[in-house]
Amino acid sequence: ALVIRNPKLWWPNGYGEPNLYTCKLTCSVDGKISDEKDITFGIKKYEYKMINNVVNYPVLTFFINGQKIYLKGGNWGMSEYLLRCHGKEYETKIKLHKDMNYNMIRLWTGCVTDDEFYDYCDKYGIMVWNDFWLYVAYNDVAEPEAFKANALDKVRRLRNHPSIAIWCGANETHPAPDLDNYLREMIAQEDKNDRMYKSCSNQDGLSGSGWWGNQPPKHHFETSGSNLAFNKPAYPYGIDHGYGMRTEIGTATFPTFESVKLFIPQESWWPLPTDEQLKDDDDNVWNKHFFGKEVNTQFGESSSLEEFCEKAQLLNIEVMKGMYEAWNDKMWNDEAGLLIWMSHPAYPSFVWQTYDYYYDPTGAYWGAKKACEHLHLQWNSSNNSIKAVNTTTKDLKGAYAKATIYNLNGKEVAAYGRTK
């Protein structure tokens, strides 16, 4: 047995340092080294509790090293749509998540397999919600023995990473019973119950999936939308289970003009499709996110793509910040965390991202960074209240809060403050 006295513990971002150790193993034969390996690990203890919220629905709540953890983060699919992300490039992506004050990434359907992803999550204190390769349309597989062998290899290969916080069987569904039982029993044996195995990503202590749209902040403060997707009831429950722990909620996120120019030919820049042109296309993502309509309603019609992109960043900030702040407002009373869909783009896109494919931060990036700061002051646009949100381990006393109002040109127009 390896005994470490007074170890420095591994902590997620915002709760302490992600301390790591390196163990060097050497195998010798007749006094000569035949093989050696360095193993990096962190010392931590994950725990999980179901705590009923205000609507008496159990909420999955995470603890690490005895400390209750408020989850803030986002979902990843692929690292890059042509599988060209390797090595140090993962560090750039993970550091951007740390900079947004996130502490968790959910690997949707386990799309990322590179060791470097986990290494940098360990290094920067980003916990990993680790899915297996099943989702709502496919909860069974053609060759179950091959699936089981891959699952066993995955757990054995990754279990030493302190960043892995939970294993999850399937996205928005449960694995077929035989696979579900295998995964639960295998993880209990191979990971020694160090991390929870959870069958489904959005049920059983979790509050569903969605919304996916650009609702104003006031909307999110007033309703969790846990029974809705694209504003069409009822999914996945048919009733509202409160804010709870949400593993998916997302919006369209328009990139900056500098990035749009890189993947849209100039002849297609302008004009954008009108609401009238799209009114009968119910499956159009633009319609489902209400993006163009909201930009035009709040900031006026644009005369060019560049002007529209500039205004879009203001909406990106407002909507992303509003979602996180609505969950902040209910912290420990009704909910335990929020993971947005998605925080990382695998390709050039107009939806589901914080920074874009070219690493240019959108307004959503700055909205997330602000709302997720470890000590945050926020305004509830529904009841006009001000609240200080503290997700650190330290009590806050004698703090001075200051609010400053700027116009759209960045000029200060009013300010006031208070000590409490």
Show where each model-derived region lies.
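Short, well-ordered amphipathic alpha-helices
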Residues: 3-6, 24, 184, 321-326
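A broadly tuned preference for mixed-charge, low-complexity surface segments
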Residues: 23, 125, 158-179, 222-223, ...
